[in-house]
Amino acid sequence: MNIDIVISADHIDEKRLIKKTVIIIDILRATSVITTAINNGCKKVIPVLTVEEAKDIAKNSKEDIILGGERNALKIDGFNFSNSPLEYTKKYVEGKTVVLSTTNGTRAINNSFNAKTILISALINSKATAKAIDKLNEDLIIINSGTNGQFSIDDFICSGYLIDCLYNIRKDLELSDIAKTAHYIYTNNKDIESFVKKATHYSRLKSLNLEKDLEYCFQKDIIGVVPQYKDGYIIKSNI
C-alpha cells in the first residue's frame, strides 16, 4: 500500500486523486465536528464552500437542518452552531442534517471529489479509520486541510498517528518522503497536544478561550465510526 500526504486544501491536484482512497484530516476542527456529529446520530453532513450555499440549502430543504461552521474560527452569523464539536451532541443532531461550512475542512472535502473513496478522519477516530483503510487495501492519499492554504502541524502529526495505526495492522506500507516525515514526527512526539501547542492554529483557538475544544480534539480514538463522503454528503461508512 502506497501512502502520500497533501499538506493543505490548496495543494490538492484533482488528477492525482482519480481511483485513489483519500482521507481528509482537519482535527481543529472540521473533521472532529463531522465525526462527532455522525457518531451522535446525525442523519448526514453536507459540506459546502460558502455561507450563501449553506443558507440556500436550509431555506429550500424539507429536512430538519442545522447550520454549522466558522470563518476564522468564529461562528457564522445566523448559523445554529459554530465549529465546536462539543456543540454537536446527540440531543441536538440525532436524526437531523447538518450543513457545514468551514474555512479549511469543507474546502478540502469538496476539492477531493475525483477520489474513488473519501473518508473523514481525526485523532478521535484514527484507529477506526486505519481498520477501514486496511479493508479497502488500496493506495492512499492523506489530505491535510491545513490553515488558509498553508501547512498545519496539527493535521500533519495526526497523519503520522494514522500511519502508525496502520503499521499496527499491516507492515506492507510504502511511504512517500513526506509520509515518512509525518510518521517520524509522531513516533517522537506521542504527546501530540504538547507538540502542537506552539502551532499557529492552536494558538488562535486558545486565544478565543476554546481550550475545551482543544482538549476534546486531541483525544485519541474515543469514537469508533468513520464518516464517508459520497454524492455530496457525508454519512457513516459501512466499510
UniProtKB/Swiss-Prot annotation:
Protein name: Probable 2-phosphosulfolactate phosphatase
Pfam families: 2-ph_phosp
Enzyme Commission code: 3.1.3.71
Cofactor(s) listed: Mg(2+)
Ranges in a coiled coil: none
Keyword Coiled coil belongs to the record: no
Organism (species): Clostridium botulinum (strain Loch Maree / Type A3)
HAMAP family tied to this protein: ComB
Enzyme class: hydrolase
